[in-house]
Structures are given as C-alpha cells and as structure tokens.
C-alpha cells in the first residue's frame, strides 16, 4: 500500500498513541520523519526517539511524554500537505497559540522549529503545528 502523506501518518500515530496512553509508537522511518522527531524532542514534546533496523526496514520509535497522566501534546496539526503546500517567509512565520506552541518548518538549512528559523532569518514550508 502506498502512502500519499507519510508525515500526516506519523503525526496521526503520535496523536492516537497518546490518546490510547501508549508509552511509545513505532512507524516506518525516513529522513524527514527523523528530523521532525528531533524537533519534537528538542522542544520537549516527546521524551526521545530512536531508529532501528528490522528485517531490512528502518523503523522510527518515538517515546511519548505525559505530565500527571495527561499527554504533553494537546494539539498536533498538519499544515502543509501534498495537495496544498504552505510556504512562509521569515516575516510571516506563524506564532502558534501566541508563542506557546511550535511550528515545524522545513527550510533550506533543514527542518527546525519556527523559533530557530526566526533566529536564522529564513522561512520555508510549514510542516505542522504543535501545542
């Protein structure tokens, strides 16, 4: 089965895993998914991530984070998708929930948070919002 939007699949697996109370979720790995997981870990939304090789297939395992039994991630929303790409320059980068959330941005310097993109003075494709 081909997957038209693997990033949306990753975000859905994380969202569903937290709703179900799982400690971690496993999914097929790619460079983009690992970069998004790195941003999620750096911003404190997930505990950690790891990439392993099973039967010749690379798998990404994301360890979910909870605070007092509640998921740390309250909102996880895909913005730019294959049918409608969303690009913003450095001055138009959004502040998610007034700066309390994070926008994951794909830039020419790699995938990073909106704060890092503002510091670097570059814009790019808005992958998702997290709060």
Curated annotation (Swiss-Prot):
What quaternary arrangement does the UniProt entry report?
Answer: Part of the 30S ribosomal subunit. Contacts proteins S5 and S12.
Q: What UniProt keywords apply to this chain's record, in alphabetical order?
A: Ribonucleoprotein, Ribosomal protein, RNA-binding, rRNA-binding
Biological process according to GO: translation
Spell out the PANTHER family in the cross-references: 40S RIBOSOMAL PROTEIN S15A
The protein here is known as Small ribosomal subunit protein uS8
Q: What does this protein do?
A: One of the primary rRNA binding proteins, it binds directly to 16S rRNA central domain where it helps coordinate assembly of the platform of the 30S subunit.
The scientific name of the source species is Hydrogenovibrio crunogenus (strain DSM 25203 / XCL-2)
The record's section on PROSITE patterns has: RIBOSOMAL_S8
Annotated signal sequence range:
none
Q: Which family does the record claim for this protein?
A: Belongs to the universal ribosomal protein uS8 family.
Entry keyword annotation includes RNA-binding: yes
Pfam families in the cross-refs:
Ribosomal_S8
Q: Which InterPro entries match?
A: Ribosomal_uS8, Ribosomal_uS8_CS, Ribosomal_uS8_sf
Gene Ontology annotations for the cellular component aspect, listed alphabetically: ribonucleoprotein complex; ribosome
Q: GO MF annotations for this entry? A: rRNA binding; structural constituent of ribosome
């Amino acid at each position: 089965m081909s997957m038209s939007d693997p990033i949306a699949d990753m975000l859905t697996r994380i969202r569903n895993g937290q709703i179900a109370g799982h400690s971690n979720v496993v999914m097929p790995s790619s460079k983009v998914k690992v970069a998004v997981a790195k941003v999620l870990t750096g911003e404190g939304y997930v505990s950690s991530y790891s990439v392993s090789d099973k039967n010749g297939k690379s798998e990404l395992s994301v360890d979910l984070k909870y605070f007092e039994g509640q998921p740390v991630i309250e909102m996880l929303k895909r913005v730019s998708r294959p049918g409608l790409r969303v690009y913003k320059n450095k001055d138009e980068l959004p502040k998610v929930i007034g700066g309390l959330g994070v926008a994951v941005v794909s830039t020419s310097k790699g995938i990073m948070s909106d704060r890092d993109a503002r510091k670097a003075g570059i814009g790019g494709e808005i992958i998702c919002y997290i709060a």
